[in-house]
Amino acid sequence: MELVAELLQRPSPVPLDARVFLQVHAELMGPIYPFAGRWRTVSLHKGDGPTRWPLPPGGIQPLMDVLERDVLSRSPLLSEDDEKVFSYAAEVMCEFLALHPFREGNGRTAFIVANLIFMQNSMLPLTTYERRSDEMRYLAACEAGRLGKQYRPLAMLLMEWEDRAVAQWRASHE
């Protein structure tokens, strides 16, 4: 992504805010959806089930303001302790996904922002998410974060995926 590359080239690490999510989403989904880079204005359903993410009366922006105040304000998180980095990335992803602020592309946007957090900490971006084998664990981990603010399950998955990314990088550079 050009945006992430540009953010990483800045002289100091870029703090996360709602604009970063909007920009990532616009760049990622812009070629596909006319509503890319804008908060959703509709309730969301998964399949034929009930409304899963109702549209709040005040819209999405007030919820993003809370996310900025309570979570994103601690960015950029720079740490030599990888566990702190994974824990923070998991919290950002879980809290963002709990809001589901876009009509489409929330998961992909969350992964790209997590990769920005990792790369700001000299870690590799995640490239090894295996949908078939990891999807149920990933969804369960996100649900644990959404319902109970339990971020550790997702942090553990992120660590596992980072280990895979490192192993792939090493194998390709031997």
Segment roles from a protein language model:
Residues 1-174:
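FIC/Doc superfamily catalytic core
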